[in-house]
Amino acid sequence: MKFYDLMCKAAQDVGLELSKEQYEKFIIYKNLLQEWNEKVNLTAITEDEDIIKKHFIDSIKAFKRDEFKEAKTLIDVGTGAGFPGIPVAIMNENIQVTLLDSLNKRVNFLNLVTEKLGLKNVVAIHSRAEDGARQKNLRESFDIATSRAVANMSVLSEFCLPYVKINGHFIALKGPAVEEEIKDSDKAITTLGGQLLDICEVEIEDTELKHNLVVVKKIKECPKVYPRKAGNVTKKPIK
């Protein structure tokens, strides 16, 4: 019951309630993650307690921003093993979640999780971020683009902002020290049609971890030249 209590507390902290049914979905998800991780490299975090805190609770804390409660559509860019997209879909079944990843094996895992958990509000797409943003049905189509991928804000902005509708939001789940990174990404955010709105600190229950939600509002259309071709985004970030 320790994990259930921890997750309930985390959910309450962001104005949500975790039902037993939702908790059971998280446990099935955890078991699948551990099982698949033995054959596909999904995560370096493999212990029960670490998965609960560093993956599940960390993802649930995104709901500290009301945008995650109010949005109808969300894309999780470079979702990997499904964070934060799948936890968001479990906690809010009214949001349509698109999971985007460049590795087909991970997409197969995500499809299995979606099926086993009975998530009707999730679809997984196999694509690089740069390529997906050129598709008409995906470009500037989402209320929220989010990412917990390990890349700096300049790179993430070019990966994510092209997916966001005007007046929608790009919300990055980042680590504890983001000030310098934000400063360096100012030009990228502006160039891509965004405006920095807020940096929101979150704490992870029963740990000393502190993370940040970096919130960028999409205020104008993203120029058609972005995102650039695969490789250019990471090699030559907009500065």
UniProtKB/Swiss-Prot annotation:
It is an enzyme of class 2 (transferase). Its EC number is 2.1.1.-. One of its GO terms (molecular function) is rRNA (guanine-N7-)-methyltransferase activity. SUPFAM superfamilies: S-adenosyl-L-methionine-dependent methyltransferases. Its main location: cytoplasm. One of its GO terms (cellular component) is cytosol. It is found in: Cytoplasm. The keyword Cytoplasm applies. S-adenosyl-L-methionine binds at G78, F83, A129, E130, R148. Pfam families: GidB (PF02527). It comes from the Bacteria. Keywords: Cytoplasm, Methyltransferase, rRNA processing, S-adenosyl-L-methionine, Transferase. InterPro entries: rRNA_ssu_MeTfrase_G, SAM-dependent_MTases_sf. Belongs to the methyltransferase superfamily. RNA methyltransferase RsmG family. Specifically methylates the N7 position of a guanine in 16S rRNA. PANTHER family: S-ADENOSYL-L-METHIONINE-DEPENDENT METHYLTRANSFERASES SUPERFAMILY PROTEIN. This is Ribosomal RNA small subunit methyltransferase G. It comes from Clostridium botulinum (strain Alaska E43 / Type E3). The lineage of its organism: Bacteria, Bacillati, Bacillota, Clostridia, Eubacteriales. The gene is rsmG.
